[in-house]
Regions:
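Conserved N-terminal phosphate-binding loop of PLP-dependent enzymes in the Aspartate aminotransferase
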Residues: 1-183
Length: 183
């Protein structure tokens, strides 16, 4: 749900057999959901032989949070565009400050900064990253009040709660952090 109201399905123009949704469907609460083609979903109880249940299944607090989150997203169709603009601004600033020494991957409101000069498209290219430099980058930002993913192998997420001032401050400090590193 981080790139559009139908997530990667809409972004990449695909129709999957099964869709899984994580915390966003519960407004950040511990919940997940899945759905799929009719013939697959008919295999799930009570219509089919596959039983699915769990401790958190149908948790009223999480489902209420999820309904409210989905209502907010539905009633504000520009939210995805705002998220992408904010994230693109951060990604562009990191690319510029990294001066070819980092690979910044970004889509929608998701981004990652890899400390490698090559494109990162898979695990093999990701592990060429310099984790010590990332740790220094992380520490520089954390010491100045900016919390990013503690590992370059995790995705950073931008929220609509992040203000333009937050984005500007992060761009400035990320640039300083990257310029302080010895590439």
């Amino acid at each position: 749900v981080c790139s559009s109201d139908l997530g990667a399905q809409q972004y990449y123009h695909i129709k999957p057999d099964i869709t899984t949704l994580g915390k966003i469907v519960g407004g950040g609460m511990p919940i997940g959901a899945y759905g799929g083609r009719r013939e697959i979903m008919q295999m799930i109880s009570p219509d089919g032989p596959v039983y699915q249940a769990g401790t958190l299944s149908g948790n009223p607090v999480a489902t209420t949070a999820g309904i409210e989150t989905l209502n907010i997203l539905k009633n504000d169709p520009q939210i995805y565009e705002r998220l992408e603009q904010k994230t693109r601004k951060l990604a562009d600033a990191a690319r510029k400050a990294g001066n070819g020494h980092v690979c910044v991957n970004q889509i929608g409101s998701l981004m990652s900064v890899f400390f490698t000069e090559q494109k990162v498209r898979d695990f093999e290219s990701a592990v060429t990253s310099n984790t010590e430099q990332y740790a220094d980058y992380f520490g520089y930002l954390l010491d100045r009040g900016i919390y990013i993913a503690p590992s370059q192998f995790e995705t950073m997420f931008i929220s609509d709660a992040h203000t333009e001032e937050d984005i500007e401050k992060t761009c400035k400090l990320a640039g300083e952090a990257l310029c302080s590193l010895d590439f």
